[in-house]
Amino acid sequence: MGKYFGTDGVRGEANVELTPEMAFKLGRFGGYVLSQHELGTPKVYVGRDTRISGQMLASSLISGLLSVGIEVYDLGVIATPGVAYLVKKDGASAGVMISASHNPALDNGIKFFGGDGYKLEDEKELEIEALIDAEEDTLPRPSAQGLGMLHDYIEGVRKYQAFLKTTAEGNFEGYKVVLDTANGAAYTSARAVFADLEANLTVIGENPDGLNINVKVGSTHPEAMAKKVVETGSDLGLAFDGDADRLIAVDENGEIVDGDKIMFIVGKYLLGQGKLAQDTLVTTVMSNLGFHLALEEAGINSVITAVGDRYVVEEMKKNNYNFGGEQSGHMIFLDYNTTGDGQLSAIQLLKVMRETGKSLSELASEVTIYPQKLVNVRVKDNAAKKSAMDVPAIQKVISEMETSMNGKGRILVRPSGTEPLLRVMAEAPTHEEVNHVVDTIVEVVEAEIGVK
């Protein structure tokens, strides 16, 4: 990670850390880096989620892109994977998404996709950062001829919807489904897609006002959806996050089905169809021990990466795997798209239910999840989170807790990729043990580097 770019683009509090001035620079310098070798006029797609700051940042970013001669196509409010899909399909030079995903409305972010639809490599991000930090802006400044033009590309959302529907390979007639679009980007597509696929729908989190994105709705707050599933007697609920690159489901009983369980369900189905490349699923260090045991029993190999969907995708590309994801709900189907896609994942999950004739609770019951506890400790700043593992007291308590578990569980302490948080996670055979381990470590972390 560089000075400005984290694991998922540039993030910060809108108009405080991520300012219009920074957005302009990212547009100008990012656009130049991504299009400097184009033979014709470069074309860049820009999308955003529903945050109130999205229009402000989009205006500045687009101005920066236009200033270096780039033709900009404004997609408006669209899911992050929609930008990635359209860039690759239409042969655009690059794409930019303005979103802070599952973060609250006061935050925003800017992430770039290359012409191949994948997130930028570290080298390209460092090149952009070097231009931002240079003492002088030496990039071309055309005055009339050579400036870019801005085009509305609202039909891009409809193209993305059409693509999603083709992946269902049939319809979902007879299924009662609750959708939760998190008052976010999926509100422009999810209802239309699943209605066209003939599901019987109830939709919540579909009234964005610029401030309510992810507030008590969406994949990080599936409780409202779970309640609605039970109330309506639905077959399942499908919750997306603010930019709709994640999916968390709930079964017909209102029980949460997280990314681990969804990956197992879909991975096992793909294996049975001979469509799981190298019989392997790529996941991260956050995936539950019970998930790995279920994979082993099903005859599925697993490859484990660092946390972050970009690392899952890197591993998949490097070794030609086609399915992977994270416990948090990012799932990547490289046969269909280049990045995590919540709506695509939802369609694939429903497809497994349709093809097997099984309920979601029945499919999910094959994975026995170890009790897991995750606590996010807010620390003083990003420097504190990065150096946390060098603090002797923190090292000592982790070592003591690992010894006490005697190999029957695991501990993971890591910095957040996007916020000043230290994530403390443990798994153990019992809730009592996992609570003791996490609470003991959290107490020391808060004392040493926590926000007082």
UniProtKB/Swiss-Prot annotation:
Its EC number is 5.4.2.10. Pfam families: PGM_PMM_I, PGM_PMM_II, PGM_PMM_III, PGM_PMM_IV. The keyword Phosphoprotein applies. It catalyses: alpha-D-glucosamine 1-phosphate = D-glucosamine 6-phosphate. The keyword Transferase does not apply. Signal peptide: none annotated. One of its GO terms (biological process) is peptidoglycan biosynthetic process. Activated by phosphorylation. It is an enzyme of class 5 (isomerase). The active site is at residue 101. One of its GO terms (molecular function) is phosphomannomutase activity. Keywords: Isomerase, Magnesium, Metal-binding, Phosphoprotein. It comes from the Bacteria. One of its GO terms (cellular component) is cytosol. Coiled coil: none annotated. The modification Phosphoserine is found at residue 101. Mg(2+) binds at residues 101, 241, 243, 245. Catalyzes the conversion of glucosamine-6-phosphate to glucosamine-1-phosphate. HAMAP family: GlmM_B. Belongs to the phosphohexose mutase family. This is Phosphoglucosamine mutase. It comes from Lactococcus lactis subsp. lactis (strain IL1403) (Streptococcus lactis).
